[in-house]
């Protein structure tokens, strides 16, 4: 990651660069500026912020923006990863490499630890994605984090679409949409009572396409699973899932090799791959530009549990 790069870029034929505005700033420049402002606002308002960092593309772009926000000084926040134990090996290897290269402090909250001590129980379907809330809230309370940066975007899902950039969480970590504060212009209110904290979403106004165009412009390295590759998968619920001891395949589900890539990265047991030949950033940008499905709608089994699955989890303290 190079925090020194950036600027106004004219639109290229491959669609990987933002369109210039009359005042000289591209669409990506405006999004970047907004995110940088949010990072600096949090640094000024809060005492112990932390950045959620899983090694997924949104958290990678978020970290890149944090680097730009404070360069040449180091990022003044720690990183936090809630580890389900069902991670893609390529993503964990990338996470560790980035943390070591940047010399940042990474706190890991392990779902397995809470299963081992009896606080959590394995789900019948094998997925651990919904189990992340308890380790997340425990880490926030134990380290006394008062602001938590997340990579959520409003285009991903309807519950995230209505959440504010500064999202107040109560003393139990829960989100109440009725307590949301107005955010006029670029004025953000970080006031909170003891025991409460604020989730902050610097990428709220970005889309999946914006993220990939920014990755192209800034030449940001991503884990290889975001690009087309050969992988063993099986079909379930209209999605291609990776085989594993925790989630399948079940009886009647056949494993086959396909050329796929991942649009989003989460728990292996509930994150689906999509058929794809997109092997480069430009290929991915072109593919997303013509897609009619959101990344979570196409690839996340945990969001299909009910119409309000994401909102229900967020009310309990989820990301």
UniProtKB/Swiss-Prot annotation:
User: Catalyzes what?
Assistant: sulfate + ATP + H(+) = adenosine 5'-phosphosulfate + diphosphate
Would you identify the family this protein belongs to, as annotated? Belongs to the PAPS reductase family. CysD subfamily.
Q: In which pathway does it act?
A: Antibiotic biosynthesis; mitomycin C biosynthesis
UniProt keyword annotations, A-Z: Antibiotic biosynthesis, ATP-binding, Nucleotide-binding, Nucleotidyltransferase, Transferase
| InterPro entries found in the cross-reference section | PAPS_reduct_dom (IPR002500), Rossmann-like_a/b/a_fold (IPR014729), SO4_adenylTrfase_ssu (IPR011784), Sulfate_adenylyltrnsfr_sub2 (IPR050128)
Q: What is its EC number?
A: 2.7.7.4
The record's function comment reads: With CysN forms the ATP sulfurylase (ATPS) that catalyzes the adenylation of sulfate producing adenosine 5'-phosphosulfate (APS) and diphosphate, the first enzymatic step in sulfur assimilation pathway. APS synthesis involves the formation of a high-energy phosphoric-sulfuric acid anhydride bond driven by GTP hydrolysis by CysN coupled to ATP hydrolysis by CysD.
Query: Where is region (Disordered) located?
Result: 1-22, 296-319
Q: What is this protein called?
A: Sulfate adenylyltransferase subunit 2
Q: Name one GO molecular function term.
A: ATP binding
**Source organism (scientific name):** Streptomyces lavendulae
GO process annotations (BP) = antibiotic biosynthetic process; hydrogen sulfide biosynthetic process; sulfate assimilation
Question: What's a Pfam family this protein contains?
Answer: PAPS_reduct
Q: Which gene encodes it?
A: mmcV
């Amino acid at each position: 990651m190079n925090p020194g790069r950036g600027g106004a870029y004219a639109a290229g034929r491959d669609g990987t660069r933002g369109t210039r505005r009359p005042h000289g700033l591209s669409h990506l420049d405006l999004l970047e500026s907004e995110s940088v402002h949010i990072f600096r606002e949090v640094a000024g308002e809060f005492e112990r912020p932390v950045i959620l960092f899983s090694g997924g593309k949104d958290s990678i772009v978020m970290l890149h923006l944090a680097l730009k926000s404070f360069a040449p000084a180091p990022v003044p926040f720690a990183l936090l990863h809630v580890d389900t134990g069902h991670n893609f090996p390529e993503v964990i290897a990338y996470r560790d490499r980035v943390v070591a290269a940047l010399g940042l402090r990474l706190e890991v909250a392990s779902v397995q630890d809470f299963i081992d001590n009896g606080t959590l129980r394995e789900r019948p379907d094998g997925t651990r994605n919904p189990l992340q809330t308890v380790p997340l809230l425990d880490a926030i309370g134990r380290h006394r984090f008062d602001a938590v940066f997340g990579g959520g975007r409003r285009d991903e899902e309807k519950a995230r679409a209505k959440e504010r950039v500064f999202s107040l969480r109560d003393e139990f970590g829960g989100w109440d949409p009725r307590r949301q504060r107005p955010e006029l212009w670029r004025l953000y209110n970080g006031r909170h009572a003891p025991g409460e904290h604020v989730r902050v979403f610097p990428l709220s106004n970005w889309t999946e396409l914006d993220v990939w165009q920014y990755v192209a412009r800034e030449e940001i390295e991503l884990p290889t699973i975001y690009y087309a590759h050969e992988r063993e998968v099986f079909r379930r619920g209209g999605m291609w899932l990776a085989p594993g001891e925790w989630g399948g395949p079940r009886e009647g589900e056949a494993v086959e090799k396909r050329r796929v890539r991942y649009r989003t990265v989460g728990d292996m047991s509930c994150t689906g791959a999509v058929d794809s030949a997109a092997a480069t950033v430009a290929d991915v940008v072109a593919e997303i530009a013509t897609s009619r499905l959101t990344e979570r709608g196409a690839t996340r089994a945990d969001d299909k549990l009910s119409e309000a699955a994401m909102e229900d989890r967020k009310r309990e303290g989820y990301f």
